Amino acid sequence: MIPKIIHCCWFGRSELPPLAQKCIASWRKYLPDYEIKIWNEDNFDVNQIPYTQQAYRCKKYAFVSDYARFKILYDNGGIYFDTDVEVIRSMDEIVSQAPYMGVETESYALYEKIISCSVNPGLGLASPPQHPFFKDMMDLYKMLDFEKDKKDYALKTITQYTSEMLQRKGWIPQKGVITKIDDITIFPKQYFNPFSSKTGSFEITDSTYSIHHYASSWLTSRQKLINKNKYVSLFFWLLHRSPKHNLKGLIRVIKERKVWH
């Protein structure tokens, strides 16, 4: 049984931005029976493991929440969302299949065969308390050295760590298909991340339950500049390859993600 509580994290003591407030309002609208609990420095010990202590000291608050979400769900159970996730319809059918996570990106080779796939627990995940997968993730983070990885430019995202852990346990993704590993349900990309890099827009389907707006709060100014350059380079490369097909979508990507600014 999944406790009727939605967890999110907001470290750093800054005000919640308008996007986060909008997303939290959507949780209240579509999951009205759930309590919403915002975790921060006042109710979560950021010094409990070296990784979160170091990340907090470096003001990399999103990395603090990477560990925190697993600890919080392991202790309490419930649903977790990143604060840039907007729910657009009732989640009852999804929660009934918990524990669950969602695919963020899929890459395909010839004949639409998946060659890489990533699962992002920030899109939304739910579990009863004491789930062993969350314990495995907590144990992993306890071994990490944030400051060393940051210095060596070796920091990994929670998406990388989670996907690698699932694959070590035998998870094999399939395009557009709900899959399972152990007792965890993994929903395809269109369920929680309907953004299309091809069209530059959200492609909402009957299977879409939420939208991830990608606030990217963990990125430094330098990393955001690198992302900007990647988008600009991608724009001209794809425009050269297929101008009529890609121009409209790529202009929309650049405008929506504001990579020119």
Language model region names:
Residues D66-G78:
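Small-residue hinge/turn detector
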